Design a protein with these regions (language model features):
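Short linear regulatory motifs enriched in tryptophan with gly/pro/ser
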Residues: 13-21, 25-221
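Extreme N-terminal basic, low-complexity initiation segments
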Residues: 2-8
Length: 221
């Protein structure tokens, strides 16, 4: 059964999947399968950094190594604080990995992210790839595979370990637009400050980072 949940703290809807049968007689079976998976599973530890902004905005997080690039995209959206309202892509060694619709329209020789698992292209610690979100604003991220680790028993993946600074607001004009926004918000006499306040609905704290809130959302994935 597919359920649509609304999380007031994030002001957004999140799709989650629940197997209703697993809540009854099949729960022990699914629990055993998960234990078996954990026994052989490895974990990828990534550090993602938003490029072009200082001090840097970054997150360190861990995922099961066998997830698809689409699942990685969804996790990145959550740990960074984006709202998944725009196109995106991964680039590794000149290879484009993105959703099937974008491939059909733009990159015919690319790779479908929903049919491609991480180990098909990412196998060694130290590998880097580019993740771009919102082709208009052009938010570019560097994604570094820091470590390959055994999964820990009793730990939910994905999980965020650490991070710094808040994600910029959506549709603010990219790196330069965000710099202008922060400049206006820091100066109460700035001519554009009221416009930004009306648009955003609140003050912007560029240093904000709530690890607990991020992991609470990841628990639903």
């Amino acid at each position: 059964m597919r359920l649509l949940r609304f999380y007031p703290g994030r002001n957004r809807f999140v799709y989650t999947w629940h197997d209703c049968q697993a809540r009854s007689g099949l729960r022990p079976f699914h629990h055993q399968m998960e234990k078996k998976r954990m026994a052989t599973q490895t974990v990828y530890q990534f550090k993602i950094t938003l490029k072009g902004i200082r001090p840097p905005i970054w997150r360190r997080f861990q995922v099961h190594s066998d997830i698809t690039f689409y699942e990685l995209h969804r996790i990145i959206q959550e740990v960074m604080g984006w709202y998944d309202g725009h196109l995106h892509l991964f680039e590794l060694g000149g290879m484009i990995i993105t959703d099937g619709e974008t491939l059909a329209e733009v990159w015919e020789d690319g790779v479908d992210e929903q049919r491609t698992r991480l180990p098909q292209f990412i196998r060694q610690a130290g590998q880097k790839l580019r993740y771009e979100y919102d082709f208009g604003d052009g938010w570019e991220h560097e994604l570094l595979l820091e470590k390959i680790l055994p999964a820990e028993a009793g730990v939910h993946y994905p999980r965020c370990l650490k991070g710094k600074r808040a994600c910029p607001p959506e549709d603010c004009g990219g790196v330069w637009g965000y710099a202008g926004l922060l400049e206006a918000m820091a100066d109460k006499s700035h001519s554009e400050r009221e416009m930004y306040l009306e648009w955003l609905g609140d003050e912007v704290d560029p240093e904000a980072f709530d690890l607990a809130e991020i992991n609470e959302t990841l628990q639903e994935m």
